[in-house]
């Protein structure tokens, strides 16, 4: 004989598909999985022997499976009456039920009507909500009378034991968005790495590879307080290795771009041998980079890092409670405030300070690139501001690196015939730095 009837409305589901095949959203699944062990723990020992009846609709079946997992129960019974909202059929089935605790997983408004009929008052059964009703009847009423109430008897004989509203899916929707951002970053890096291995001679390819690499590194850094510590330890070394291995190649490409600009402006002659000398230096560096990044150990480490991005290992606290939008937005806002403080009064003559500031600006750029939809239009508007600041800082960084390369190459046998052209490049870059310093803005938040 049923003593306790538990009514469960299915969790938040997808929209737009055929009704029977609508699934729970991933956020809906996560919200139920995180909350149901505690909620169904309210049943105490009685929950261990509970029977679970469910509507055949997929969203209800998925909810019932999460209930079963929370109770460590086996087997579900499908009852069409719960989907058809067939009260006489359900009443007949209840009269023959044997379990002392029976759980019904179904839909609104039907479950709400069942609860109201048994209790005499309306219950707010939100999606994922659970209520437990003592259906043994009040003093002087037989058990059978309780089920007859469902057929129209007005006197309510059930007693509400407890009601828990459906859990909010917002923290899990945020987590889903972060999962998607991580997967998008992983796909970008995977594709960029494959393209680099196929076409290492193309400067645009190496630039795209480094952009994807830096993006995944900075996204991992941004999420690091939310991730399992081991996941961060797996990813960071390979990102650092690959960025370090490709840095000089990118610097040579930047120098090559400067030489091309100076030839176009006429500051360097069209027949300058500096072009071929730089190309030779790039070929040597490209071969070194290709050899380093094609090693099996490096590829295996990258694969592990990508796997961590495709399936992020969130911390136990995140898996338990999800992530609020405020967790993400406040962290981003703190980044902006930190960068504004650094840019105000920045010493543009200090290579280390400019380089560090540019890295922080690019961190914001990459976070906006991956999370702009989540962060909203107001924060997304900083994208152009960051790009403008990045352009100025990059101009200075590239010029400073070009000057450093000139100092290195002017004593090299490979550049012995182009020292005068190297001097032209160096002088041009010094003038460029001075111009940027004279015209720069000091704060991004003005």
Residue positions per predicted region:
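Active-site-proximal alpha-helix that buttresses catalytic centers in soluble enzyme cores
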Residues: 2-80, 122-125
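Generic beta-sheet signal
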Residues: 5, 50, 99-106
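Alpha-helix N-cap/helix-start capping motif
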Residues: 11, 57-61, 108-109, 127, ...
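Short alpha-helix plus adjacent loop in nuclease-associated cores
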Residues: 81-94
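Active-site histidine-anchored catalytic micro-motif
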Residues: 105, 113, 129-130
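Domain-level recognition of soluble alpha/beta enzyme cores
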Residues: 121-144, 148-155
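Short, solvent-exposed aromatic-acidic interface loops
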Residues: 146-170
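Function-determining surface determinants
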Residues: 165-446
């Amino acid at each position: 004989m049923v003593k306790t009837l538990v009514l469960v409305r299915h969790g938040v589901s997808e929209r737009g598909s055929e009704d029977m095949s609508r699934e729970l959203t991933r956020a809906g699944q996560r919200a139920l999985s995180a909350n149901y062990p505690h909620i169904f723990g309210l049943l105490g020992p009685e929950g261990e022997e509970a029977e679970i009846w469910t509507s055949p609709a997929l969203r209800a079946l998925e909810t019932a499976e999460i209930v079963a997992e929370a109770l460590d129960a086996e087997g579900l019974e499908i009852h069409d009456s719960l989907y058809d909202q067939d009260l006489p059929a359900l009443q007949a089935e209840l009269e023959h039920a044997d379990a002392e605790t029976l759980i019904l997983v179904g839909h609104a408004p039907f479950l709400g009507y069942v609860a109201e009929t048994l209790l005499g008052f309306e219950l707010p059964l939100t999606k994922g909500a659970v209520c437990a009703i003592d259906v043994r009847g009040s003093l002087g009423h037989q058990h059978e009378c309780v089920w007859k109430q469902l057929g129209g008897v007005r006197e309510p004989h059930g007693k509400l034991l407890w009601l828990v509203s459906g859990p909010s899916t917002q923290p899990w929707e945020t987590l889903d968005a972060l999962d998607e951002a991580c997967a998008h970053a992983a796909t970008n890096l995977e594709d960029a790495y494959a393209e680099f291995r196929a076409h290492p001679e193309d400067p645009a390819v190496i630039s795209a590879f480094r952009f994807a690499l830096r993006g995944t590194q900075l996204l991992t850094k941004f999420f690091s307080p939310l991730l399992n510590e081991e996941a961060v330890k797996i990813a960071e070394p390979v990102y650092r290795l690959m960025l370090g291995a490709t840095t000089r190649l990118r610097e040579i490409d930047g120098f090559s771009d400067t030489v091309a600009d100076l030839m176009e402006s006429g500051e360097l002659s069209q027949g300058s041998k500096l072009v071929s000398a730089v190309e030779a230096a790039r070929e040597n560096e490209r071969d070194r980079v290709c050899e380093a990044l094609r090693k099996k150990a490096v590829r295996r480490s990258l694969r592990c890092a990508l796997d961590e991005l495709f399936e992020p290992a969130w911390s136990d606290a995140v898996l338990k409670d999800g992530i609020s939008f405020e967790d993400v937005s406040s962290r981003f806002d703190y980044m902006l405030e930190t960068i504004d403080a650094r840019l105000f009064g920045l010493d543009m003559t200090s290579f280390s300070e400019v380089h560090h500031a540019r890295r922080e600006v690019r961190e914001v750029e990459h976070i906006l690139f991956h999370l702009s939809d989540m962060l909203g239009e107001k924060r997304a508007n900083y994208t152009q501001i960051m790009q403008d600041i990045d352009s100025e800082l990059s101009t200075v960084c590239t010029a400073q690196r070009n000057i450093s390369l000139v100092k290195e190459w002017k004593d090299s046998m490979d550049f012995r015939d182009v020292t005068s052209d190297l001097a032209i490049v160096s002088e041009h870059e010094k003038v460029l730095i001075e111009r940027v310093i004279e015209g720069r803005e000091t704060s991004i938040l003005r």
